[in-house]
């Protein structure tokens, strides 16, 4: 079984000391979706609800989620984010509004939590933008698709339903 690095020998949570690690290029890509009912799907495809363009605001929310990760996740290190790329995709057959977030930096620790936080917050913002039309939406799963850097190097995690390849 893998060792849980965020616990001390007594089982108490600690922030890991990353100072001995080498600074390397870190990249993480995560994706997730919001499943919409018919009224929300119609509002999204028609350019939005009463609050404006949902995609644009969700993209901004995703960037904000990336930037605030260390405030939201207690043991996450604050990182000097160098780039955030947010892409959206509408799947009309399954009524899924997808977001993909890629984050990069030079650092001593992984950036996966930032990518996942970005996707999660972006999807919550999308829900917020459409809830005036309908509350019949389901926040779907979000998951890591790819990470680069650190001792494991490149890790890809394919997701069959996802519109993007890792």
Which residue ranges define each predicted feature?
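C-terminal binding/interaction regions
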Residues: 1-55, 60-166
């Amino acid at each position: 079984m893998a060792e849980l690095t965020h616990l001390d020998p007594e089982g108490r949570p600690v922030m890991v000391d990353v100072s001995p690690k080498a600074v390397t290029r870190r990249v993480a890509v995560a994706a997730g979706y919001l499943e919409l009912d018919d009224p929300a799907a119609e509002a999204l495809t028609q350019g939005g609800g009463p609050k404006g363009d949902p995609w644009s605001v969700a993209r901004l929310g995703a960037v904000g989620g990336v930037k605030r990760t260390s405030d939201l996740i207690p043991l996450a290190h604050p990182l000097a984010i160098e780039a955030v790329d947010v892409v959206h995709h509408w799947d009309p057959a399954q009524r899924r509004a997808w977001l993909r977030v890629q984050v990069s930096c030079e650092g001593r620790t992984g950036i996966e939590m930032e990518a996942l936080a970005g996707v999660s917050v972006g999807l919550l913002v999308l829900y917020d933008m459409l809830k005036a039309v309908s509350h019949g939406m389901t926040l779907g799963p979000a998951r890591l698709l790819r990470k680069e850097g650190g001792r494991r190097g490149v890790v890809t995690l394919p997701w069959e339903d996802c519109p993007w390849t890792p």
